[in-house]
A protein has these predicted regions:
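Extracytosolic ligand-binding ectodomains
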Residues: 1-300
């Protein structure tokens, strides 16, 4: 978070007038304090914590943590994916704990039971044998992982080593697991996740973006890349709608942009007819994906 604030101050010194960023929740929550002080417009592509956009100058492209938790519980319940669910989450991370809290709340309305909920922390995120043993001992047929892909890759490997093979289900933080260095991608076969972007979608916008991204970077884009791409064009839409110009200055631009964010709609890679509430949250539908044959596949 400190590095993010330092980077913000550097960019401000260079003449930045609005901010697309930051990428994740903890840095975003720190930086939004600064953009609020400066009345600078901020649009985070993928900072999902509630606190990341707690001021009226800040908006986001991605789902909120509570939204992901609620949507995941509904999807698992409505599609009858499991009767007994275990959760492994990071209690030291606002992204993970925020999703888990709302998941547990919505689970009470669904036809499955949370039989195990075990936390880890940033200081202890390499050995998951205790959490997995408790899930296995409780006969969980699905393990919900509201965490990022690095830790998830370790969990999948350790589950395989102990002969535990439940369905694994995560959120947008799992998008990118196939690219983890030295990870056996076959371990992720059948993993499901709710995420706003599917690189194998067949609409022209997605196909064009994926081919251009692969040509530029030699890799398939994930939802972080797609959220950031959409963020740039959302800002463009807001600028055009508001008539803001560089001459308005940082505060003037911010006032104009936040005034129109609740009026614009945008068709992007991560959602159609996206719209924004005054609290900065986006309205769009999540997409369910499953990893098949080493690729992310959209569940139709």
């Amino acid at each position: 978070a400190e590095k993010a604030v330092n980077a913000y101050n550097t960019l401000k010194d260079w003449g930045m007038q609005m901010l697309v960023g930051t990428v994740t929740s903890n840095p975003c929550t720190a930086v939004v304090e600064k953009t609020h002080e400066d009345n600078m417009f901020q649009l985070t592509p993928s900072g999902s914590a509630v606190e990341s956009i707690k001021y009226d100058n800040a908006f986001r492209v991605c789902f909120s943590d509570p939204g992901q938790g609620t949507a995941s519980a509904k999807y698992i319940g409505e599609n009858k994916l499991a009767s007994k669910v275990a959760v492994i989450y990071n209690s030291s991370d606002v992204y993970s704990s925020g999703i888990y809290a709302k998941f547990a709340e919505e689970a009470a309305n669904q036809n499955f039971e949370i039989v195990s909920a075990e936390a880890f922390t940033a200081d202890n995120k390499t050995d998951f044998s205790v959490q997995l043993s408790k899930a296995q001992g409780a006969d969980a047929d699905l393990v919900f992982l509201p965490i990022y892909y690095n830790e998830a890759s370790l969990i999948l490997a350790q589950a395989k080593a102990m002969g535990y093979a439940p369905k694994f289900f995560g959120c947008d933080g799992l998008d990118g697991i196939l690219g983890v260095e030295n990870f056996d991608a076959s371990l992720a076969e059948g993993v499901m996740l709710l995420t706003p972007f599917a690189a194998d979608a067949q609409d022209d916008a997605t196909k064009n973006f994926v081919s251009a991204y692969e040509a530029a970077y030699g890799d398939t884009p994930n939802q972080f890349a797609a959220d950031a791409y959409d963020a740039v064009y959302v800002v463009k839409e807001a600028i055009e709608k508001s008539g803001a110009t560089p001459a308005d200055g940082v505060s003037g631009i911010c006032d104009k942009l936040k005034g129109v964010m609740t009026e614009i709609t945008y068709d992007g890679l991560t959602g159609s007819a996206m719209s924004w509430a005054a609290d900065g949250t986006v309205n769009k539908a999540p997409k369910a994906m499953e990893i098949k044959n080493g690729e992310y596949s959209l569940i139709q």
